[in-house]
Amino acid sequence: MSTLEIRGLGVTYEGASTAALEGVDLQIESGEFVVALGASGCGKTTLLNCLAGFIDPTAGCARLNGEPIAGPGAERGVVFQKYALMPWLNVIDNVALGLRFQGVGRARRREIARETLALVGLDQHADARVYALSGGMQQRVGIARALASDPQVLLMDEPMGALDALTRETMQELVLDVWGRTRKTIFFITHSVEEALFLATRLVLMTPGPGRIAESHELPFARQFLASRDARAVKSSPEFIQWRERLVRRLHGEPHTAREVALS
C-alpha cells in the first residue's frame, strides 16, 4: 500500500517574486493514476520534483506512507521527458543500472531487467544499444528502468512530450497497460488535455501564479480502455468530448457552463 500526502506545500525559488507553488493539498491513494494537467508555468514539474525528493518545499510537506519525503528513494521511480539513458550501455544494462547501485547481484538484476523489459514489450531488444532505438522505444526503456526497482510510486514528468503524435498514442496505451497489470500508484504530469483525460483515474487541474490545484475529478476513461482495448471508441465518446471541451475552457480561464456543472 502506498499513500502520497501533500499538505500546504509551497515552493518559492530564490530570487523569484512569485511562488512556484502555494498551498497545495493533495492525497493520492494506493493504485490511483493521478494526472496533473496545466499550462506551462503552473508548477506541475515543481510539484513532481518535490515528490521525487529532488527539491525541498519552502512550506508544507509531502509524505509517503506517513514518512516525510527527504531526498530521492528507490520507493519512488521517476520517468523523465528526456530519456536520461546511458548511451554507452545496452538496453538491459540501462534497465538494471539502478539495481546495480542498490547492490543487487548481476545475475539477479539481469533477470529482473528482462522481466521488466517484457512488461513494456522490449524483451527482444535487451542487447541493443539505446542510441539505435526510436524515441518511443527509448522511453519504454526509461519506463522499464523506473519499474525495475519495484517502486511503490511511479512519477512521470511529461514522458510523451518529445514523441510524435502516433507514437504518443501508442505509448499512452502502453502506460495504461502497465498500470493495469501492476496497479502501481502513478503521478503523471502533462499539458495535453486529451492525454490527461485518457490516462487519469483522477485528474487535478492546476492554475499558475502561484501554482495551485483548482479542481479534482474522478474519470472513467482509463478503465473503459482497459475493458475495451479500443482507444478510438473511448476518445470519440460523447462523454470524453464533453470533458475535453470543458477542460479546454477552464484552461483558458472561462467559467463553468450550466451543462458542465451538471457533469461534475
Swiss-Prot record:
Keyword Transport found: yes
Annotated binding of ATP, by residue: 38-45
Molecular function per GO: ABC-type taurine transporter transporter activity; ATP binding; ATP hydrolysis activity
Gene Ontology cellular component terms for the protein in this record: plasma membrane
Domain ABC transporter intervals: 6-233
InterPro entries, A to Z: AAA+_ATPase (IPR003593), ABC_transporter-like_ATP-bd (IPR003439), ABC_transporter-like_CS (IPR017871), ABC_transporter_ATP-bind (IPR050166), P-loop_NTPase (IPR027417)
Locations listed in the record: Cell inner membrane
EC number: 7.6.2.7
Membrane topology listed for this record: Peripheral membrane protein
Keyword Translocase: yes
CDD domains in alphabetical order: ABC_NrtD_SsuB_transporters
Pfam families named in the record: ABC_tran
Record field: catalytic activity: taurine(out) + ATP + H2O = taurine(in) + ADP + phosphate + H(+)
UniProt keyword terms in alphabetical order: ATP-binding, Cell inner membrane, Cell membrane, Membrane, Nucleotide-binding, Translocase, Transport
PANTHER family, per database record: TAURINE IMPORT ATP-BINDING PROTEIN TAUB (PTHR42788:SF18), TAURINE IMPORT ATP-BINDING PROTEIN-RELATED (PTHR42788)
Primary role: Part of the ABC transporter complex TauABC involved in taurine import. Responsible for energy coupling to the transport system.
Assembly, per entry: The complex is composed of two ATP-binding proteins (TauB), two transmembrane proteins (TauC) and a solute-binding protein (TauA).
Family as reported in the entry's similarity comment: Belongs to the ABC transporter superfamily. Taurine importer (TC 3.A.1.17.1) family.
Name listed for the protein in its UniProt record: Taurine import ATP-binding protein TauB 3
Source organism: Paraburkholderia xenovorans (strain LB400)
Gene symbol of the encoding locus: tauB3
